[in-house]
């Protein structure tokens, strides 16, 4: 009987401890380590948004399709938003695609469609990415285990 009482008391207090735990993901900045370039790299990361053990991740793309350097902090334009399997710029990527929201005439050339942005208008978290481009289009991404929820605001 005493063991049962102790178990109930322990269970009661342990749930209170878990209820007070902080949401640590709010402190994660996925832009950390993105100040990389081919000559000298400071982290070799890109601001990936994805679920743990997901099929793929999602990221803003400042580099060209097919290059390993998907995102570089010093670059001030976005060429698209891409699905990725890449774990490091040195490993490159495979079976990826990118897209770019726009208005007006369709522009397929990634250099011509690149749009300027400011890091002041960018939020990069593991579970959410948002950027407002200088042309006024806002892109938001929230990952799932097999894809991503996208929202474009014009």
What are the roles of these predicted feature ranges?
Residues 20-154:
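Accessory carbohydrate-recognition regions in carbohydrate-active enzymes
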Residues 4-13:
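Sec-dependent N-terminal signal peptides
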Residues 15-19:
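Sec/Tat signal peptide C-region and signal peptidase I cleavage site
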